Amino acid sequence: MAAITAGLVKELRDKTGAGMMDCKAALTENNGDIEAAIDWLRKKGLAKAAKKAGRVAAEGLVAVESSGHYAAAIEVNAETDFVARNADFQAFVREAAKVALNTDGSIEAVAAAHFPGESVTVADKLATLIATIGENMTLRRSVRLTVSAGVIATYVHGAVSEGQGRIGVLVALESQGDVEKLSTLGRQIAMHVAALNPLALDASGIDEATIAREKAILLEKHQGKPANVQEKIAESGMKTYFKEVTLLEQPFVHDGSKSVAQVLKENEGSVGAPITLKGFVRYALGEGIEKEESDFAAEVAAAAGQS
């Protein structure tokens, strides 16, 4: 049986909004497994649906870079937030983002590419930076989006310098229309993505396991009702779920009376051509990475015992 610590209870409470005793019971029932405990609480009707937002537990920077019909995003992690304010680290991340823009965008291609203006690779340059700053760093992930016509809008939230911050977003709008108006619309949608964190563009982008899990939770919450009634409730519940987590169906953050899809359609007139939201990327710093939390009191006690 896993130990149910106060920290574990707090983490579950932060993720679900459920009461402390309910969180403790959920963790006890599920042997300390956070994800299983979330499902347990939801089946009991004690927690809201959780989006797939990983625990933010790593530092560093997310950066975006764009040029014409191309844009890239990259995440470089470090051990402390102090490094994110280091000018050398920021310069490295900026150049690494440019490399992502000029390669296929994969993190493997970025690491192996030559660092701009030097005869070493990006990976080698990072190794030198690690030795200089004295803190471990990693090239975590990168991506590149392209359009044949239109724009790729970018947005950075929590910026510490131009194009670098804690959340980076790319939004690809394919269109033959007015570029300036497309850019304005794209930035608004990028801000929406940063704020509402959609899981996918539409329902087809959500994996079958996630859909099955959501439906199972809905069905279990209405056990005891006739099967046909349960199915209707689950069908209605899944429609609501898709509206909450898919970009095109989400209420637009700048005007909640319209969906993002409706906003795109309405703007086609002023842009002068059809608009297709081809894709988006949202990188949140440290998302999905767990960082070991030190027990300061235990460290002090251990140090005292060694002295």
From Swiss-Prot:
One of its GO terms (molecular function) is translation elongation factor activity. InterPro entries: EF-Ts_dimer_sf (IPR036402), Transl_elong_EFTs/EF1B (IPR001816), Transl_elong_EFTs/EF1B_dimer (IPR014039), Transl_elong_Ts_CS (IPR018101), UBA-like_sf (IPR009060). It is found in: Cytoplasm. It holds the Pfam family EF_TS. Residues 80-83 are annotated as: Involved in Mg(2+) ion dislocation from EF-Tu. The keyword Cytoplasm applies. It comes from the Bacteria. Signal peptide: none annotated. Keywords: Cytoplasm, Elongation factor, Protein biosynthesis. One of its GO terms (cellular component) is cytoplasm. Associates with the EF-Tu.GDP complex and induces the exchange of GDP to GTP. It remains bound to the aminoacyl-tRNA.EF-Tu.GTP complex up to the GTP hydrolysis stage on the ribosome. Belongs to the EF-Ts family. This is Elongation factor Ts. The lineage of its organism: Bacteria, Pseudomonadati, Pseudomonadota, Alphaproteobacteria, Hyphomicrobiales.
